[in-house]
Amino acid sequence: MANFLISVDKTLRHEGGFVHVKATGEVAKFGITVWFLREIGELPPAPRTDPARPTEISFVRRLTRDQAVEIYRRHFWERYRIGEIRDQDLADKVFDLVVNTGPGGWASIKGRRVFKRGALVLLQEAVNELRGKPLLDCDGILGPISLARVNSTEAGALLDVLRAKAADRYRSIAAANPPLAPNLHGWLERLAA
C-alpha cells in the first residue's frame, strides 16, 4: 500500500497558494477550485459557468493546508483507490495526475455524455500497452481487476509508459485549446518530477 502523505506532499509542491484569475473566473488554493468545492458540497451548488461569489472567494482564501490534505485524501486518494497501488512512485504519479487531469471515463458536460482520457484511463491504457493486449477496460475505474493488473505489472516500465501517455495527452490539450498552450511546459515539467 502506498503512503498518502508522501504522495500529497509531492503534489502540493506543484499546487500553489491562493489564485484568482479574474479573466477566467478561476479561484483556487492548493489546487482546489471553487468549482470542485461546489461539486463536493463544501460550497452551495451552482452552475460551473457561474463566477465565484465573494463569499466563495473568501472561503477558498481561508482554506488551510490541513483542510486541503483532507479533501485530497477523501475525494481523490480514497475515492479512486490510489492507496491500493503497491509501488509508491507509481502511486505518487497517478495521484498527481488525477489531481491535475481528473480520473477520466464518462462524464456529463452540458447535458452530453463525453469520454475523458484522464489519469486512470491513461493508467489502464499503459497496462494494456505493456501487456501487449487489452486486458483492461479503459473506463477510468480503478477496481479490483485493474488494481491486480497494475500491481502485477513492472512498476518502473508502467510509470514510463504512463508518463509518455500523459505527455501526449497534455500536448493534444494544448493543441486543441490555444489559450492553454502556455501551460504545456509547466505540465510537462510536473509530469517529469
Q: Each PLM stretch: what is its role?
A:
Residues 1-193:
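Cell-wall polysaccharide-cleaving catalytic domain and substrate-binding groove, primarily
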